[in-house]
Amino acid sequence: MHCGLLEEPDMDSTESWIERCLNESESKRFSSHSSIGNISNDENEEKENNRASKPHSTPATLQWLEENYEIAEGVCIPRSALYMHYLDFCEKLDSQPVNAASFGKIIRQQFPQLTTRRLGTRGQSKYHYYGIAVKESSQYYDVMYSKKGAAWVNETGKKEVTKQTVAYSPRSKLGTLLPDFPNVKDLNLPASLPEEKVSTFIMMYRTHCQRILDTVIRANFDEVQSFLLHFWQGMPPHMLPVLGSSTVVNIVGVCDSILYKAISGVLMPTVLQALPDSLTQVIRKFAKQLDEWLKVALHDLPENLRNIKFELSRRFSQILKRQTSLNHLCQASRTVIHSADITFQMLEDWRNVDLNSITKQTLYTMEDSREDQRRLIIQLYQEFDRLLEDQSPIEAYIEWLDSMVERCVVRVAGKRPGSLKRVAQQFLLMWSCFGTRVIRDMTLHSAPSFGSFHLIHLMFDDYVLYLLESLHCQERANELMRAMKGEGAPADTGEELMLMSSTPTSTSPAPYSPAKSVHSVGVPAVGSPNSAQSPEYTSISATTGAVQSYTWSLTYTVTTSGGSPTEPGSQLSCMRGGPALHGSSSAHRMPVYPHRDEHGYTGSYNYSSYANQHHHAIQSQYSSLTHEAGLPTPLHYSSYHRTSAQYPLNSQMSRMESCLMSGSPLLHSSPVTPRWPDVPSANSCYSSPTVHASRYSTGDMYSPLAPRRNSEYEHAQHFPGFAYINGEATTGWAK
């Protein structure tokens, strides 16, 4: 924020006090040189101090500061002007004022984040308090020192008022809903992949993604780790067979692209918006931790699913880091671009650049140098020249960069499908070479505005990279969408054979992967590039043997003898690899997820609150395992409830909590039909260790559905078709 020299305010309330001080100082100066004067300096000081009948009161001063001033980003007040306000206050209160240094300490008690800047023209600069403004209700109110804008005086004497820079907070996006996810009716599913299960998974995953988005908006980034862990490690057993399908993996990739784009738009809607330092720090921390959280949450899941999740999350983290650094460069470049003197000097240096030589050197980097490329470089040169000449704001430069990428990359790649990466590489090479040549030319000629050009060059480079990375992510999502719909290649009807087949045999269990499964040989793992291989995955070759054991980290072990058919009550044969248990044909084991206690895993992800769903006979279709006789009692743990009071995304309005639609809290008007009813069997798959109950109480995560008091719904925000989000959350953004 640039502030110029601010004149002292002309206030009638202080004129008399200033005149009296001048008269008294003049009389003291005369009397000190008079031979008649017999009053010492100590007596004069004592007389001066005794003018006020009341001693100085710091609490009264703090109260006065609170009533008349407020924190405002980008507003400057001269230190002398604020001290004059304070002296006027002391005079009206008939109290003894403190000196300017002591008053500065009192101000910092009331406004600790206040900073001091020396502003003004050379030789006439003054100290200013930066970040404080006079309230409109104050008697000292002046538009120059208010939130409506800070004023400065340029060389021509023209006063301009700048817009106040308001720090952005993602809380303004509360209630944001995700765009539509893919519809199962539009997908080209293999015949052996049940459409019903895919539809159920999309519903579950949309709810999971919506929760992550809501958590990010409320700034509770640490809860994202818990949601990831509970969703993937608490997946219902009957949904596990579909996770390794290439179609479901593509669905996850498309949905993740939608989620990441929504999060990016919520955290930083535009790179030009000023962000608080606290928000920038938590965004960078979140981008750094997301990959580690996914490694833990996706432990022992199908390899192609892990790969697509890792690939998209790392691209998303890179874009977040790019946005934060770009935002910092934009704020620094704004002060340069909005200065008339700097832009005038930049224009002069820009026109002194040897354009012909730079153009020839740039064209050397092109594969096929053509005349239209030379004309394009000259056209871009002239457009930037016009922006400098018009002293355009930074928003105009951003629009120019957007149009440049649109003309040079998007339109060219649109004529040749699948060529986006190559076209972007060629443009980036030309752009980097031209910018480097310009900076080199200015360095050799000692251009006065070299520093400003260097800053603008950094900002332009980062913004172009940000646009190209965003285009690449969108292209990747489009590829996954085409593969999901079967437009690129027909769906492999044989890849889902494992859902209905008997259990193969092997001497040692291997982690489940469709690319290595006996029934899915030759099926490629769609969306699983080698560059995004999971560090935890270790390939184990499957061999033929007498006993094959398929386990899942959160379920029980099922063992079948080689050549014998699978028992009707056994688990399906596409569980995750784990340690083999030999002995009986049906073995029971404890949940073996290794990071359960460390990450507070409860072992359950309950979707029973979702209504308007068709009921399925899950108990008869997926029989539970028999309990081992060696264990005295079954394990009983509390479920991880997710109530429709918080996320009734798929509920009818009549089944939503009545208090969301009226002022009185009531229970549900009709019972909610559970999507998957709780099976009261002795060997329930999901468990919650007692240590979790002590570390994470139920109220910390999700409160049970119960009547609530009217006081709990104050300040609540309501959104049609969605649960309320309390605007006064415990953990919020720093204002």
UniProtKB/Swiss-Prot annotation:
Question: Entry's SUPFAM superfamilies?
Answer: Winged helix' DNA-binding domain
Q: What is this protein called?
A: Transcription factor RFX4
State if Nucleus is listed as a keyword: yes
Protein role: May activate transcription by interacting directly with the X-box.
List the residue ranges of the region (Disordered).
25-59
Biological-process GO terms, alphabetical: regulation of transcription by RNA polymerase II; ventral midline development
GO cellular-component term (any): nucleus
Which stretches of sequence are listed as region Necessary for dimerization? 315-487
- Report the locations given in the UniProt record: Nucleus
DNA-binding region per Swiss-Prot/TrEMBL record: 44-126, 61-136
Keyword Transcription listed: yes
| Record keywords, A-Z | Activator, DNA-binding, Nucleus, Transcription, Transcription regulation
Gene encoding this chain? rfx4
Q: Which PROSITE patterns match?
A: RFX_DBD (PS51526)
